[in-house]
């Protein structure tokens, strides 16, 4: 017997398809929607439709945007000689909110994760190499071994060489590639793979520092975080 509205149950079911939303939370959301003014509900519905119809990916950096190229890639005020590589568009947003970075970006679309069946060909890794050197061709990618990690978490992947055998300097004018991937095994594997892939090119490959958060206490930090903080220590200004 149906004790509640079929429309409400359908909405609850749709809400449960969202990440981290369980049945109880979905039902609370559905009940909240019932109490919302009609115009607010229509605004949400229109926003959901617009996201699927109007949003696209920048053909240069692959960030989610309303235009192509995106405002960052299309701006002459950004430093195109520096590319910050991130996993997802949300990571780009986080970095932009610091107002400290003036370069451009490259969104990978994830990280290399052999356990999840995600390899380099599933990401926009080779598109990054092409941005640095337009003559780069990914002819050896299929023959390259899949990235793996050793028991201690170190990546032992070997990146496929570029067909041009290396470039004396990046033809696109890129001087530095900053790897802003998460500090975990998958992030380490991805960073290692990219660093090896870009080795033939005359570009500096760096990775964002890892260490203690501002306001954090040493006694609560784990050993790995403390080790990274010590390794990345700098001069006191």
Curated annotation (Swiss-Prot):
Q: SMART domains recorded for this chain? A: TOPRIM
The family annotation for this protein states: Belongs to the RecR family.
Instruction: Return the Pfam families for the record.
Output: RecR_C, RecR_HhH, RecR_ZnF, Toprim_4
**Source taxonomy lineage?**
Bacteria, Pseudomonadati, Rhodothermota, Rhodothermia, Rhodothermales
What name appears for this protein in its UniProt entry?
A: Recombination protein RecR
Query: Which segments constitute the Toprim domain?
Result: 81-213
Task: Quote the function comment for this protein.
Answer: May play a role in DNA repair. It seems to be involved in an RecBC-independent recombinational process of DNA repair. It may act with RecF and RecO.
Q: Where are zinc fingers of the kind C4-type found along the chain?
A: 58-73
UniProt cross-references to InterPro entries, sorted A to Z? DNA_Rcmb_RecR, Rcmb_RecR, Rcmb_RecR_Znf, TOPRIM_dom, TOPRIM_RecR
**Alphabetical GO biological process terms:** DNA recombination; DNA repair
Q: Which GO terms describe its molecular function?
A: DNA binding; zinc ion binding
CDD domains documented for this protein: TOPRIM_recR
Provide the residue span(s) of the region labelled Disordered.
132-171
Q: Which UniProt keywords apply?
A: DNA damage, DNA recombination, DNA repair, Metal-binding, Zinc, Zinc-finger
SUPFAM superfamilies named in the record: Recombination protein RecR
């Amino acid at each position: 017997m149906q004790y509640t509205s079929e429309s409400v149950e359908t909405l609850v079911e749709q809400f449960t398809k969202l990440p981290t939303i369980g049945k109880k939370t979905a039902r609370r959301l559905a009940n909240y929607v019932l109490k919302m003014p009609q115009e607010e509900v229509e605004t949400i519905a229109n926003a959901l439709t617009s996201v699927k119809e109007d949003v696209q990916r920048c053909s240069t950096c692959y960030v989610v945007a309303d235009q192509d190229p995106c405002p960052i890639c299309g701006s002459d005020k950004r430093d195109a000689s520096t590319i910050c590589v991130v996993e997802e568009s949300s990571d780009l947003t986080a970095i932009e909110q610091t107002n400290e970075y003036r370069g451009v970006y490259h969104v990978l679309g994830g990280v290399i994760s052999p356990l999840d069946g995600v390899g380099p060909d599933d990401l926009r890794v080779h598109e990054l190499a092409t941005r640095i050197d337009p003559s780069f061709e990914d002819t050896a990618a299929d023959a390259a071994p899949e990235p793996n990690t050793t028991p201690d978490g170190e990546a032992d992947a070997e990146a496929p060489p570029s067909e041009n055998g290396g470039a004396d300097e990046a033809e696109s004018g890129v001087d530095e590639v900053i790897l802003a991937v998460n500090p975990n095994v998958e992030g380490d594997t991805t960073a290692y793979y990219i660093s090896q892939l870009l080795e033939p090119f005359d570009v500096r490959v760096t990775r964002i520092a890892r260490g203690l958060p501002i306001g954090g206490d040493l006694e609560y930090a784990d050993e790995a975080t403390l080790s990274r903080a010590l390794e990345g220590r700098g001069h006191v200004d």
